């Protein structure tokens, strides 16, 4: 790293009182748009109001003003999250059996919702144990609270109030930084300073403070809880923080204070900063001393990372230099020009972040079962299934959003004259090769993965089981996956000799059971997994094909060379040009959402059945008795098996839930099917049909002299599609949710 002359001094500049605080203005619907502010003449107005309220690009073209609005909106977003969290903690304090659950987490089920006795719906308050009647929850909050050392409802109340105080502060912050002291554009574009502060401050100090909490509060409290001490007898958090002797009784190295730290004898601290691997056999969760160690290590790494970028001192990296130096022999100008894109297009920035965090959320979904981070999480099957499903859906939506904002960037913010022969330009120029190859891959994967199932269904139907692909006939073992599992099982002996076991028991090793229930065991992979994994590959590639085609052809195509002029969303390329409908970038996102839904559905079905068949169950003297008795390997290799032994067999709980505490899931299952079916009305019918119908209804109103002042209009083609896809996804997700929960709460 060379020492250079400092960059131009960064001055923190804010503009004082840039926008007047005016309740009169806010009270006027559509105040952000000249057209909308005039008020409604047709019913289209309300749709445009919702479409454009947060599309800050449509309010102004001034990047500084857009940046301030986004920045201010983030404060509001954080406030909403804090209010929601506060509500969760309040429910835990006011309406839950948390203290009872804490004293016996293996037999008592978590509940933090009590239904009021109106029209007989108190039937939903099932007996969850510990003399408590309520709705069983599957959010994992109880497990998080125990891991963080919360032992009483008073602590939950206090945290709930703290959340509301923080929410108030963020709301004031959002108002203050837009109306009183708004940052200038230069501040939003100062990426080096932003990286330093976010890496060292948010992630580094955030992880450090959490590690401190874990070490001084969570670890001692959980150590005592694991030993069976009554929560009411355990000292309060501030006693552990203020009285070192208390901690030293549990972790002797505390008596030595900071001496080992400054004398570099760090191994002295290994009684509370461990590197064990595997799960705590008492709770079935990761060792909390491992996770404290992890957060401390993350803090150190990110605090160092937050000192890497060059600001007012002449040392460190410049992001522009890094990007412009990034070129190889075959990549033309490399990343030259990307710095300008990422500092002037927040859509480009957002697309990258959504792609990254979407992928990360999907990785989190897998870690939540493979390395369950909280005590008693692994044996709470309803929560495990809910957390996996939730993070998979969220990840799918974020990745689809990445494609949406990448396309918006190309339509609204991309300037081809400044991007010549860099990697982005080169990708756009050979987009035909990319898309046609990807299309071929999708066809190959589709025919081959589906073909294996069709073969099996045919052989099964003809009574020829010996000719099927299965673990007992023609084997297609996932040998690469099995090799990876084996390698990871053996890894600790070589790479981490002090670790007691590998990172996850799913790789291999010994079963962990808590209270007679399986927490985790090595997950066997066979022919049925090989087949469904290729369906995963197929659905994911098709989703990517649709979304990537939308991005790469967002500005132009052979069919519509001037697509950029038509905008991000448009129904067709004007009258007189047939065959040009559904080509806008928005339409690709619309279509991509359906395939995203396909992809995630297959994944969560696979997970749900696989875990019930091969992992979850009870441990007896004869071994493990799984919920569905290992039927995945025999049945999941035919389409008929998926329909009969998964969907139909496991739907019995939700279909037969009427008259029980689970009956709400039966109603949701039914209602969500209706919502899903309702979406088809929007997706399968044309706009003209509705306009004709509306006009005859308006005629009838005129006859009766009750005609509305605001003229009714059919939804535009794009509005109709948006309503359709929203109900399709909402209906589908809620149906799956009811199906999963009724099933797993009954049998888990």
UniProtKB/Swiss-Prot annotation:
- Asked if Iron is a keyword of the record, the answer is yes
Against SUPFAM superfamilies, the record matches this protein to: Photosystem I subunits PsaA/PsaB (SSF81558)
Q: Give binding positions for phylloquinone.
A: 690
Q: Name one GO molecular function term.
A: chlorophyll binding
Binding sites annotated in the UniProt record for [4Fe-4S] cluster: 572, 581
Localization annotation: Plastid, Chloroplast thylakoid membrane
Per UniProt, what is the membrane topology? Multi-pass membrane protein
Cofactor binding description = P700 is a chlorophyll a/chlorophyll a' dimer, A0 is one or more chlorophyll a, A1 is one or both phylloquinones and FX is a shared 4Fe-4S iron-sulfur center.
GO BP of this protein? photosynthesis
Q: Which reaction does it catalyse?
A: reduced [plastocyanin] + hnu + oxidized [2Fe-2S]-[ferredoxin] = oxidized [plastocyanin] + reduced [2Fe-2S]-[ferredoxin]
Transmembrane region(s): 70-93, 156-179, 195-219, 291-309, 346-369, 385-411, 433-455, 530-548, 588-609, 662-684, 722-742
**Which Gene3D superfamilies does this one have?**
Photosystem I PsaA/PsaB
> What Enzyme Commission number(s) apply to this enzyme?
1.97.1.12
- A Pfam family reported for this protein in Swiss-Prot or TrEMBL: PsaA_PsaB
- Keywords for this protein: 4Fe-4S, Chlorophyll, Chloroplast, Chromophore, Electron transport, Iron, Iron-sulfur, Magnesium, Membrane, Metal-binding, Oxidoreductase, Photosynthesis, Photosystem I, Plastid, Thylakoid, Transmembrane, Transmembrane helix, Transport
Matching PROSITE patterns, A to Z?
PHOTOSYSTEM_I_PSAAB
What superkingdom heads the lineage?
Answer: Eukaryota
Q: Where does chlorophyll a' bind?
A: 673
Q: Main subcellular localization, coarse class?
A: plastid
Tell me its family. Answer: Belongs to the PsaA/PsaB family.
Q: Could you give the subunit structure recorded for this chain?
A: The PsaA/B heterodimer binds the P700 chlorophyll special pair and subsequent electron acceptors. PSI consists of a core antenna complex that captures photons, and an electron transfer chain that converts photonic excitation into a charge separation. The eukaryotic PSI reaction center is composed of at least 11 subunits.
The name this protein carries in UniProt is: Photosystem I P700 chlorophyll a apoprotein A1
- Organism of provenance: Chaetosphaeridium globosum (Charophycean green alga)
Q: Gene name on record?
A: psaA
């Amino acid at each position: 790293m060379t020492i250079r002359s400092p960059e131009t001094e960064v001055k923190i500049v804010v503009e004082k009182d840039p926008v007047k605080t005016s309740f009169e203005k806010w009270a006027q619907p559509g105040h952000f748009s000249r057209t909308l502010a005039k008020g409604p003449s047709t019913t289209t107005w309300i749709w445009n109001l919702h479409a454009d309220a947060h599309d800050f690009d449509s309010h102004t073209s001034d990047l500084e003003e857009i940046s301030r609005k986004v920045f201010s909106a983030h404060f509001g977003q954080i406030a909403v999250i804090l209010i929601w969290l506060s509500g969760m903690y309040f429910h835990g304090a006011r309406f839950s059996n948390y203290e009872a659950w804490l004293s016996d987490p293996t037999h008592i089920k978590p509940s933090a919702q009590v239904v009021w006795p109106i029209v007989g719906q108190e039937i939903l308050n099932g007996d969850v144990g510990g003399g408590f009647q309520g709705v069983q929850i599957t959010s994992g909050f109880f497990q998080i609270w125990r891991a963080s050392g919360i032992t009483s409802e008073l602590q939950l109340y206090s945290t709930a109030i703290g959340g509301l105080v923080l929410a108030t502060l963020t709301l004031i912050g959002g108002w203050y930084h837009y109306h009183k002291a708004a940052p200038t554009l230069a501040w939003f574009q100062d990426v080096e300073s932003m990286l330093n502060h976010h890496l060292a401050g948010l992630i580094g100090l955030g992880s450090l403070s959490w590690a401190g909490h874990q070490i001084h509060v969570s670890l001692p409290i959980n150590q005592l809880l694991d030993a069976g001490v009554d929560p009411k007898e355990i000292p309060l958090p501030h006693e552990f923080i203020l009285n070192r002797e208390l901690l030293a009784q549990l972790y002797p190295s505390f008596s030595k204070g900071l001496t080992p730290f400054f004398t570099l004898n760090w191994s002295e601290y290994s009684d509370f900063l461990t590197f064990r691997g595997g799960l705590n056999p008492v709770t079935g969760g990761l060792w909390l001393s491992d996770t404290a160690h992890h957060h401390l290590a993350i803090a150190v790494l990110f605090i160092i990372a937050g000192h890497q970028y060059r600001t007012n001192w002449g040392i460190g990296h410049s992001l522009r230099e890094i990007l412009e130096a990034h070129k190889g022999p075959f990549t033309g100008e490399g990343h030259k020009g990307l710095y300008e894109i990422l500092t002037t297009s927040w859509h480009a920035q957002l697309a990258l972040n959504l792609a990254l965090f979407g992928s990360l959320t999907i990785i989190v979904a897998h870690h939540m079962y493979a390395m369950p981070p909280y005590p008693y999480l692994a044996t709470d099957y309803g929560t495990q299934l809910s957390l996996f499903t939730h993070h998979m859906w969220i990840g799918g939506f974020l990745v689809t959003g990445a494609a949406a904002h990448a396309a918006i960037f190309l339509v609204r913010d991309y300037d081809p004259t400044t991007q010549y022969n860099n990697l982005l330009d080169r990708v756009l120029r050979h987009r035909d090769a990319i898309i046609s190859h990807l299309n071929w891959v999708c066809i190959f994967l589709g025919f081959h993965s589906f073909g294996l199932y069709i073969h099996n269904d045919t052989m099964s139907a003809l009574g020829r089981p010996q000719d099927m692909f299965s673990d007992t006939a023609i084997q297609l073992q996932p040998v690469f996956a099995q090799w990876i599992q084996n390698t990871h099982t053996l890894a600790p002996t070589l790479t981490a000799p002090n670790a007691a076991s590998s990172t996850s028991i799913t790789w291999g090793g010994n079963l962990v059971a808590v209270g007679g229930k399986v927490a985790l065991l090595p997950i066997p992979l066979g022919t049925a997994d090989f087949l469904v994994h290729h369906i995963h590959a197929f659905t994911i590639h098709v989703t990517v094909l649709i979304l990537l085609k939308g991005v790469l052809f967002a500005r132009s195509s052979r069919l519509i060379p001037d697509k950029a002029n038509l905008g991000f969303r448009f129904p067709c390329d004007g009258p007189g040009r047939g065959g040009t409908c559904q080509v806008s970038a928005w339409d690709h996102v619309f279509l991509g959402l359906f395939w995203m839904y396909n992809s995630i559905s297959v994944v969560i079905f696979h997970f749900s059945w696989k875990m019930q068949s091969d992992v979850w169950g009870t441990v007896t003297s004869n071994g493990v008795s799984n919920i569905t008795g290992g039927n995945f390997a025999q049945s999941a290799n035919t389409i008929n098996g998926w329909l009969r032994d998964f969907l139909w067999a496991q739907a019995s709980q939700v279909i037969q839930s009427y008259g029980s505490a689970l009956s709400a899931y039966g109603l949701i299952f039914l209602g969500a099917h209706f919502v899903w079916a309702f979406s088809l009305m929007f997706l399968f019918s044309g706009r003209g049909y509705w306009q004709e119908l509306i006009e005859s209804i308006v005629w009838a109103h005129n006859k009766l002299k009750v005609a509305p002042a605001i003229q009714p209009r059919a939804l535009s083609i794009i509005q109709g599609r948006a309503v359709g896809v929203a109900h399709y996804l909402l209906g589908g997700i809620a149906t799956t949710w009811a199906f999963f929960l009724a099933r797993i709460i009954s049998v888990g």
